[in-house]
């Protein structure tokens, strides 16, 4: 449907019988109205043509072959001549056969039938609105209980029942036997009701606004009572309050959407278009039918039997009529949701029939597989792995995926550069993977972003744009900082890659969807690009070390993996001498030469602004020299001062991991400052 803002949308909800009739009914040019499916047959076993008024009727759903009626006559579709647009003999219109994909039919039910989704699914909408136990409503729907109609100021049999309370159970059996079928129908229509018709009557009598007001009043009264001190009573009150809230919300929803509650009881059953429940022939000519066809046949058989009982038979007991109504209800339940009431219906091979719910729900259902997750051109899919060397706005695309996604662009590039004379030659060069193919592919990818999507896409950061680069292997490389937006990790997650084709899509990807432009959460504004997963583990390994400072060597000398591993003997006390470096470059060079480890403690000359040292820490030890200079030794650094207490130099105790981390942060801040200065 299209709303007032011209947005295409799909709305799922209850439908009125008038709307179902409007979908299915159509008036032929001769004035005949068709649309009702009355026969449970599909194809004739001799002619192999659809049966008239059956589940594949061409009069109802349209011709199987475009422009050809059931008689075999042909008319040109769209011909503006004044010839009749339908066959006068068989009543089939000369239209396109694609109409069988959307033209619906309907089954006129002989008795009302509740929609099992609204009755059995939890929470039960019907039970919530009527404020009655679900078991009681089920007994009413399946004709196990009877519902007394309020007949005022009239003598009734049910009023006499009050005088004989001990015979209440016998009335259920004695009343039907007392009357003939015609008399019982009169009595039942006047005084009692059962089946889905009783539910429909109660739903039609509801005042939704009164339900909302009364539920709110009761909820406030329960809230004012407070705790009773009895745990069981408090839980009961809490459940009642939760139920009242659900009931108010449900009633408000019906009011807001302008939907009548009695629509949850069906009088007309829609029949799906035949192309959505096909019958095909497999090898050997054996027909293979959709399970829904068999379930529709079951409904039609039972509905026709009930119609015959109500219209033709005069001596059928009322109990048999109610039993047949129950069978119709169960058949419709199986069609809508097989197995929701217990044991599912099976075929002769003990295979469970796939109902309408099975067709549309789940990962392989119509919505997730065909509508939401359908395969499209210029798209691929692969496992994601971490790419720590990538920029935030880049992703690594495998060569095998990239050459398929950008194949048309590469073909155009080969022809423009006169490396190929036609499309066939260009494709052969791509199959042979000639070097010029990769050169052109690199040029194409430099100016073309791609979209990465990880299902489920629950918010807008579930799909972001990246600048692709070629990588080896078959996995997509992803920067770990963008994992939180995708809710992804590197334990086997898969992501889909799409190529925006139009200029508008590419502009939107560059201006709005690039990963480095989506650093904040659109919901709460917090940073979304934060270290997670492998980055946290890497930062921990990078900055780990002995946090006891200089005291570690004095009281617990256990680290023997240091520079030169030089040990000094002083009164039988052994400790490891820690190396000293004048610059961070020397320390990193020693690490690359494997002379020290990543977490090896070392001393580094601090050459930055010494005025930033503003610590109130008391030195562990102060060592004086003969020239007046002295050393203040702290837990993680050492300050050398002259006689005037001026700082001459500072040595800090750190590790190679801390040095690397500090340099990365420093370079990032400097780059950010340069970018800001360019922007201003």
UniProtKB/Swiss-Prot annotation:
Its EC number is 2.7.7.6. It comes from the Eukaryota. It is found in: Plastid, Chloroplast. SUPFAM superfamilies: beta and beta-prime subunits of DNA dependent RNA-polymerase. Binds 1 Mg(2+) ion per subunit. Binds 1 Zn(2+) ion per subunit. GO terms for biological process: DNA-templated transcription. One of its GO terms (cellular component) is chloroplast. It is an enzyme of class 2 (transferase). Its cofactor is Mg(2+); Zn(2+). In plastids the minimal PEP RNA polymerase catalytic core is composed of four subunits: alpha, beta, beta', and beta''. When a (nuclear-encoded) sigma factor is associated with the core the holoenzyme is formed, which can initiate transcription. PANTHER family: DNA-DIRECTED RNA POLYMERASE (PTHR19376), DNA-DIRECTED RNA POLYMERASE SUBUNIT BETA (PTHR19376:SF54). This is DNA-directed RNA polymerase subunit beta'. The lineage of its organism: Eukaryota, Viridiplantae, Streptophyta, Embryophyta, Tracheophyta.
């Amino acid at each position: 449907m299209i709303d007032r803002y011209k947005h295409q949308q799909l709305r799922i909800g209850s439908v009125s019988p008038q709307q179902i009739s409007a979908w299915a009914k159509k008036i032929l040019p001769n004035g005949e109205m068709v649309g009702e499916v009355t026969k449970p047959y599909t194809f004739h076993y001799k002619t192999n043509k659809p049966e008239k008024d059956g589940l594949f009727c061409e009069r109802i759903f349209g011709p199987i072959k475009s422009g050809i009626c059931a008689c075999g006559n042909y008319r040109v579709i769209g011909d503006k001549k004044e010839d009749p647009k339908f066959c006068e003999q068989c009543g089939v219109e000369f239209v396109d056969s694609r109409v069988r994909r959307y033209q619906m039919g309907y089954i006129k039910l002989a008795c009302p039938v509740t929609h099992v989704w609204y009755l059995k699914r939890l929470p039960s909408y019907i039970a919530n609105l009527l404020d009655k136990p679900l078991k009681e409503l089920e007994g009413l729907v399946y004709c196990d209980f009877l519902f007394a109609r309020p007949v005022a100021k009239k003598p009734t049999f049910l009023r006499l029942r009050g005088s004989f309370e001990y015979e209440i159970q016998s009335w259920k059996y004695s009343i039907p036997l007392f009357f003939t079928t015609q008399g019982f129908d009169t009595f039942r229509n006047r005084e009692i009701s059962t089946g889905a018709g009783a539910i429909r009557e109660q739903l039609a009598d509801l005042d939704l606004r009164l339900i909302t007001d009364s539920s709110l009043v009761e909820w406030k009264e329960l809230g004012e009572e407070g705790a009773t001190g009895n745990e069981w009573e408090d839980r009961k009150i809490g459940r009642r309050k939760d139920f009242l809230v659900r009931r108010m919300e449900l009633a408000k929803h019906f009011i807001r959407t302008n939907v009548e509650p009695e629509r949850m009881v069906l009088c007309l059953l829609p029949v799906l278009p035949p192309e959505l429940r096909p019958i095909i022939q497999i090898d050997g000519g054996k027909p293979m039918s959709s399970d829904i066809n068999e379930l529709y046949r079951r409904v039609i058989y039972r509905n026709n039997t009930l119609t015959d009982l109500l219209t033709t038979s005069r001596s059928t007991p009322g109990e048999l009529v109610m039993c047949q109504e129950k069978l119709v209800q169960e058949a419709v339940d199986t069609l809508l949701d097989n197995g929701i009431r217990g044991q599912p219906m099976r075929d002769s091979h003990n295979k469970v029939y796939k109902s309408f719910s099975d067709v549309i729900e789940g990962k392989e259902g119509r919505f997730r597989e065909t509508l939401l997750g359908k395969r499209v051109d210029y798209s691929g899919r692969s496992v994601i792995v971490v790419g720590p060397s990538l920029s935030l706005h880049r992703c690594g695309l495998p060569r095998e995926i990239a050459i398929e996604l950008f194949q048309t662009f590469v073909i155009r590039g080969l022809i423009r550069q006169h490396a190929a004379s036609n499309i066939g030659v260009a494709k052969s060069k791509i199959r042979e993977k000639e070097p010029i193919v990769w050169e052109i592919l690199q040029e194409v990818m430099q100016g073309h972003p791609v979209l990465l999507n990880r299902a489920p896409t629950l918010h807008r950061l579930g799909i972001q744009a990246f600048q692709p680069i070629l990588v080896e292997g078959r996995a997509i490389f992803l920067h770990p900082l963008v994992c939180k937006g995708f809710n992804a990790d590197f334990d086997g997650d898969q992501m889909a890659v799409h190529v925006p084709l139009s200029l508008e899509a590419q502009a939107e990807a560059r201006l709005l969807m690039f990963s480095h432009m989506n650093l904040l959460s659109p919901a709460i504004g917090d940073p979304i690009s934060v270290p997670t997963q492998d980055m946290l583990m890497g930062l921990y390994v990078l900055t780990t070390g002995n946090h006891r400072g200089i005291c570690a060597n004095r009281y617990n000398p256990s680290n023997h993996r240091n520079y030169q591993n030089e040990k000094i003997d002083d009164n039988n006390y052994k400790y490891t001498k820690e190396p000293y470096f004048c610059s961070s470059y020397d320390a990193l060079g020693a690490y690359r030469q494997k002379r020290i480890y990543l977490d090896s403690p070392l001393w580094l000359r601090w050459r930055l602004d010494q005025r930033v040292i503003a610590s109130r820490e008391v030195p562990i030890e102060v060592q004086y020299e003969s020239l007046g200079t002295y050393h203040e030794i702290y837990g993680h650094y050492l300050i050398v001062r002259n006689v005037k207490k001026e700082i001459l130099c500072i040595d800090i105790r750190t590790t190679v991991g801390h040095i690397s981390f500090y340099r990365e942060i420093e370079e990032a801040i400097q780059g950010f400052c340069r970018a800001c200065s360019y922007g201003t």
